[in-house]
């Protein structure tokens, strides 16, 4: 991974997740700290975790799936980690996991920037709301969709979308044509996520669908 300050390194993926999470947490009222980037070995990650034992919440980004270099959970297992849930049937964000590291809540986010963003909005927002004793809530509105949607598969789908007004000045939702989790620019432009339940049937154009609103301008 390449850091944003070293963006001239064209052969590397820019490491944007830490900056996104830092700002996202601060906007929610938390106080975020960016720990050093761990190398792809258990010892390096364990040393960093030792520095985080006075935090209220620890978040990792990347290394949450089961590949050879995904060593986060293996490192945690050596440090008395209690896994509470993992591998969520959702898109994007399947590799997410959550548990307790010596009683400190630990949220493991996927490394893909779009997956990190979607999972932060859905999961991290609620965690921070609970920390502050706020009512856990989501801003969900029913809107007509301006295109048909195919039958969904076994995963809950969060479709990145924009919200526009029709000729009657009513809000309607328009999904982006590209939903690949590599589309960071489209995630940045998203105003909401159409929520599709697992195995949901095909939806006709004009049908009202639940939309998780993420823009303050709607």
PLM features per residue range, with description:
Residues 1-60:
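Phosphate-binding glycine-rich loops and their immediate beta-loop-alpha structural context
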Residues 57-72:
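Glycine-rich beta-strand-to-loop/alpha-helix junction loops that act as flexible
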Residues 4-6, 69-71, 118, 206:
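Short glycine-/acidic-enriched loop or helix-start segments at secondary-structure transitions
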């Amino acid at each position: 991974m390449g850091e944003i300050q070293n963006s001239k390194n064209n052969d590397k993926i820019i490491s944007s997740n830490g900056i996104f999470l830092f700002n996202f947490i601060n906007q929610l009222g938390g106080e975020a700290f960016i720990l050093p980037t761990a190398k792809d070995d258990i010892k390096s990650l364990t040393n960093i975790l030792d520095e985080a034992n006075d935090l209220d919440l620890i978040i990792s980004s990347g290394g949450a799936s089961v590949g050879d270099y995904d060593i986060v959970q293996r490192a945690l297992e050596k440090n008395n980690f209690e896994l509470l849930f993992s591998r969520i049937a959702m898109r994007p964000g399947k590799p997410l996991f959550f548990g307790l590291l010596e009683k400190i809540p630990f949220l493991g986010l996927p490394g893909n920037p779009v997956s990190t963003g979607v999972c932060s909005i859905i999961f991290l927002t609620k965690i921070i709301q609970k920390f502050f004793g706020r009512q856990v809530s989501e801003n969900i509105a029913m809107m007509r969709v301006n295109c048909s949607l195919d039958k969904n598969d076994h995963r809950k789908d969060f479709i990145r979308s924009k919200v526009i007004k029709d000729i009657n000045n009513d809000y309607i939702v328009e999904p982006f044509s590209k939903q690949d989790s590599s589309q960071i620019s489209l995630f940045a432009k998203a105003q909401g996520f159409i929520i599709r339940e697992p195995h949901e049937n095909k939806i006709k154009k004009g049908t009202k669908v639940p939309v998780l609103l993420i823009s303050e301008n709607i």
